[in-house]
Amino acid sequence: LASWLDNGSAFCNVGVFGALQAEWVTQMLCYMKAGNYSYAQPTQAAEKQWTHAVYADFARTLMADTNAWWVKVTHKPDGTTVRRTLVYVGGGPEYRKRCEEVAYGGYEGFELA
């Protein structure tokens, strides 16, 4: 499964992307502290939804047909080939929007305890 915060810095400004992730994690930790939570884990449903979105975005690119480093190519015993992205390709603004939606939604998609 693709990670909830996949590293997309291979296709954007590393500093900007790193700052976005650091801000988001910091905000989540502050939210957890205010709510007296000490544990956060993405739900299986959220992981599947995010993975599907990452793969769907990637499938719409020409990169999906390559055998480059950003693609995990698996050759199945039945002769089929499966290509999965190793990075997020949806773009910085969309990534920020998705992160903000999760935060503003009270970290919906995460189990907090």
Regions found by a protein language model. Name each.
Residues A2-A113:
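C-terminal, flexible cofactor-proximal segment of oxidoreductases
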